[in-house]
């Protein structure tokens, strides 16, 4: 049952189209996944998922919900991210290029951040921020699972970031917290949480977040604002008010045939260009309700230069581990937080004073004069000389993911793989492989 106030508003806005809109709520949910470009070595078969392309996302696919791809070892290895198809649109509109500096300001749980990272292909810097500490941990875990090496995951208030990163980013995504009306079909909580004053409350918060984002974008940079709501107050209304207050921003006109135009006639005193924003309607495409606006800041200046984070010296234990295993590293510089070593992009600015959950690629920790590699490094690695591979259906693979030791004559640190995908570490003593798959991720056989 839709909230009465919501239904009345949508009936008035959509007129004769309201019947089709209402009927879309009885349609089966669209389930989607997005392939991870960073996992190019995959040799397995995904045909059982009955994949069909998502028109607006080259790496996006609809899948048969009964196939349950989230239970496959391929999901654990970061081959794909399960994501609602319409939610794939904002990152495609932002379209970051390898080498750019990109900010995802409201990033949890990580669907759009992992999509942006896939476009950067390990080059440049991606800063992912989430103000909610619990959700920020989920974000960090998803960045790890997909093998992303050039991201800084933060748990900060947007205003604090504005003070640190003025004019620093080439591109910014603001997937703003909203009333969630586009998720009514998918999440019952979105329906029960809705109230008549929800839209205005959300719009005020969205304008504050946009103001913070604007100060971090370089002149000439691109900003995408998106929501998963139908509310004109939170969509065209927010963008219109932002544009009137920030004349150095304008709406970019992009040709995207899959989406419907924004509706300047639904808000008072509309700013120029609202018709070039985008609405995704569940009765017009296979996906949930979304809105997106692509904004450009006037000018053309290089991103601001910030003091770099100083590099740390490589501990001898890490050097010895690499000498023994031949484990590759991405380009970058070494950082140490206590006993833990990270490899981060060279351009990473100073992070002192920020709540950092993840910096680049976690390599591992120096413990009692030895080096123990991190799970994140295993997921980033494409290959290792000392590795063992199992087919997806091999019972030994299920045993590994459950935390069991495995019979093996191998010695030393060993990379466990399936069909060209790395899953984690094990350590052999000549008789068996001791399991180093993280306990929090283990699943019963």
For the regions a language model picked out, list residue spans one by one.
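Conserved AdoMet
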Residues: 31-88
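Conserved class I S-adenosyl-L-methionine
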Residues: 99-108
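Conserved SAM-binding loop of SAM-dependent methyltransferases across substrates and taxa
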Residues: 109-122
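Helix-to-beta-strand junctions that scaffold the AdoMet/dcAdoMet cofactor pocket
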Residues: 121, 217-219
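S-adenosyl-L-methionine
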Residues: 129-167
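Mobile active-site "lid"/loop adjacent to the S-adenosyl-L-methionine
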Residues: 134, 171-211, 228-235, 257, ...
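Class I S-adenosyl-L-methionine
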Residues: 169, 222-225, 230-342
């Amino acid at each position: 049952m839709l909230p009465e106030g919501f239904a009345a508003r949508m009936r008035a806005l959509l007129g004769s189209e309201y019947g089709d809109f209402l009927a879309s709520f009885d349609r089966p949910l669209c389930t989607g996944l997005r392939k991870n470009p960073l996992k190019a070595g995959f040799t397995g078969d995904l045909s059982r998922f009955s994949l069909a392309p998502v028109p607006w996302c080259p790496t996006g696919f609809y899948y048969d919900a009964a196939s349950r791809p989230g239970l496959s070892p391929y999901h654990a290895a970061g081959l794909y991210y399960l994501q609602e198809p319409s939610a794939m649109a904002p990152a495609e509109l932002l379209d970051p290029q390898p080498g750019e500096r990109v900010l995802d300001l409201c990033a949890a749980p990580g669907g759009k951040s992992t999509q942006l990272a896939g476009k950067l292909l390990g080059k440049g810097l991606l800063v992912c921020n989430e103000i909610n500490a619990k959700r920020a941990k989920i974000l960090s875990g998803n960045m790890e699972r997909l093998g992303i090496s050039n991201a800084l995951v933060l748990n900060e208030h947007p205003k604090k970031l504005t003070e640190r990163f003025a004019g620093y980013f080439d591109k910014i995504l603001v997937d703003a917290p909203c009333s969630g009306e586009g998720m009514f079909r998918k999440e019952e909580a979105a329906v029960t949480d809705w109230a008549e004053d929800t839209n205005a409350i959300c719009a005020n918060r969205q304008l504050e977040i946009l103001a913070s984002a604007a100060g971090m974008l370089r002149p000439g940079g691109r900003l995408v604002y998106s929501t998963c709501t139908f509310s004109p107050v939170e969509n065209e209304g927010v963008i219109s008010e932002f544009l009137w207050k920030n004349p150095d921003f304008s709406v970019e006109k992009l040709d995207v045939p899959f989406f419907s135009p924004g509706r300047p006639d639904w808000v008072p005193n509309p700013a120029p260009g609202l018709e070039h924003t985008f609405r995704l309607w569940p009765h017009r495409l296979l996906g949930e309700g979304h809105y997106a606006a692509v904004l450009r800041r006037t000018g053309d200046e290089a991103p601001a230069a910030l003091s770099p984070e100083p590099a740390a010296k490589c501990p001898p234990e890490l050097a010895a581990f690499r000498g023994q295993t031949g484990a590759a590293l991405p380009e970058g510089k070494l950082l140490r937080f206590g006993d833990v070593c990270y490899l981060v992009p060279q351009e990473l600015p100073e992070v002192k004073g920020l709540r950092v959950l993840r910096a680049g690629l976690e390599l591992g920790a120096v413990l009692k004069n030895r080096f123990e590699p991190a799970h994140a490094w295993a997921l980033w690695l494409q290959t290792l000389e000392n590795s063992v591979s199992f087919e997806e259906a091999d019972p030994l693979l299920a045993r590994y993911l459950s935390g069991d030791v495995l019979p093996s004559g191998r010695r030393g640190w060993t990379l466990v793989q399936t069909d060209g995908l790395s899953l984690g570490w094990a350590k052999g003593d000549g008789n068996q492989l001791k399991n180093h798959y993280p306990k929090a991720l283990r699943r019963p056989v």
